[in-house]
Amino acid sequence: MLKPKEMDAYLMKAIKGTAGYFKLSPEELARTAGCKKATWYRRIKNPENFTLRELRRMIIRYSWDASTVCSFMGVEGK
């Protein structure tokens, strides 16, 4: 069983992979995440800097499902 922090790490990895699959631009990711203007510019330079809260907002906005997330994590979804 994964610990909560480990789950968060897997979640972030999965969402970043999924974003690449949907070919979303960094600008779209930043807007969807609801970043403040100053933060937005840092995020578009390096999407790895998105926080877990911002990434979760993107899951909801783009309706990423578990099977899609799992496939990009390289694990079997149940």
Where are these regions (language model features)?
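A short, Lys/Arg-rich alpha-helix, primarily the initiator
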Residues: 1-24, 28
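Alpha-helical residues within the helix-turn-helix
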Residues: 20, 31, 60
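Short coil turns linking two alpha-helices in DNA-binding domains
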Residues: 25, 36-37, 51, 65
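Residues in the helix-turn-helix
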Residues: 28, 39, 68
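Recognition helix of helix-turn-helix/homeodomain-like DNA-binding domains
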Residues: 34-50
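DNA major-groove recognition helix of helix-turn-helix
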Residues: 44, 54, 73
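DNA major-groove recognition helix of helix-turn-helix/homeodomain DNA-binding modules
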Residues: 53-68
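Short amphipathic recognition helices of helix-turn-helix/homeodomain-type DNA-binding modules
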Residues: 69-78
